[in-house]
């Protein structure tokens, strides 16, 4: 993408997969630079930041499989405005009209804020955890970390920081072997302790 070609059509298929928000910003900057040089950029994507940075949006749906395959929205991203307060307020007239015109577009519903993912009012407490110590693989520098049991945990960080090495490269195969299951050789680690015996099976999806 760093080339200076002009008059080209660049097609990218979900380039944001695996990217941290910081890296997504950098990707958007590169795509904008390509466009500024006189190129056409077409991106297959569902990342909100990239959709909002685009000039034009084509939404395919309304659902997956045999329930999809139709264009449920096509238009300028600048026409998609977030709802502020009551949807019936005059300030939200454009958003209301857009929702009425394209009722089958889930993308428009979320970009306008008509639908949203609610943040839980409370978090599930935990008192058991798997403790991984001295994890060393690729960019990991002998880290110690706890993975709480019976809760929803997210491992995050910028691209290349060591997330996959920690989870896929060490935790997963190490735990499989502790459970006497066949697994690849894990990355280096000092110990796997805590309440790992509470785990009966390990699945990598």
Language-model segments: what does each one mean?
Residues 1-205:
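Conserved phosphate-binding elements of NTP-dependent enzyme cores
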């Amino acid at each position: 993408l760093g080339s200076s070609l002009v008059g080209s059509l660049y097609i990218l298929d979900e380039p944001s997969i695996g990217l941290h928000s910081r890296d997504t910003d950098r990707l958007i900057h590169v795509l904008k630079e390509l466009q500024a040089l006189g190129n056409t950029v077409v991106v297959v994507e569902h990342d909100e930041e990239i959709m909002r940075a685009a000039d034009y949006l084509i939404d395919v749906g309304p659902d997956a499989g045999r329930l999809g395959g139709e264009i449920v929205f096509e238009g300028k991203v600048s026409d998609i405005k977030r709802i502020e307060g009551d949807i019936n307020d005059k300030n939200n007239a454009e958003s209301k009209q857009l929702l009425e015109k394209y009722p089958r577009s889930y993308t428009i519903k979320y970009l306008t804020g008509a639908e949203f993912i609610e943040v839980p009012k409370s978090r599930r407490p935990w008192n058991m955890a798997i403790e991984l110590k001295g994890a060393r693989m690729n960019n990991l520098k002998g880290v110690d970390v706890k993975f709480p049991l019976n809760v929803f945990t997210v491992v995050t960080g910028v691209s290349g920081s060591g997330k996959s090495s920690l989870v896929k490269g060490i935790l997963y195969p190490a735990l499989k072997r502790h459970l006497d299951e066949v697994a690849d050789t894990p990355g280096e680690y000092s110990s796997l302790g805590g309440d790992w015996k509470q785990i009966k099976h390990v699945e990598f999806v």
